[in-house]
Amino acid sequence: MDNGARPLRDAKFFLVVRFWIAPGGEPQVFRWLEGGHIAEVLRQPGFLWVRRLKGTEPDATGWSAHAMIYGIESRESYDRYMANSALHARFKKERQPLEAKMRIERFAGEVDYAL
């Protein structure tokens, strides 16, 4: 996994995975993420780095807020990743035991370095 040595500016595209974890669910969710899921995503062509964030406040239901930000070489690399139906089917199956403990939403786009 990237240890932060790659410059953030290498990324021209990004994927943000926002997720909320039920109280008591963090150990199981983090075991899944750190046990291979993050590394598998970073092995995809064009994926450069990842950063994990933890929100300071839980949501209204008490679930903790988190996000993963993936830096990606290009829109084409992102599109290839999203088109990999076998990979996403496997990820979905791996997440099934976590469904009651985790809510996920995603968004992606171009990095604006003009700001």
Question: What do these predicted ranges mean?
Answer:
Residues 53, 105-112:
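Flexible, low-complexity linkers/stalks enriched in Thr/Pro that connect modular domains
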Residues 12-20:
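Active-site-flanking beta-strand signature of metal-NTP-handling nucleotidyl enzymes
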Residues 25-52, 90-91:
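Short amphipathic alpha-helical segments
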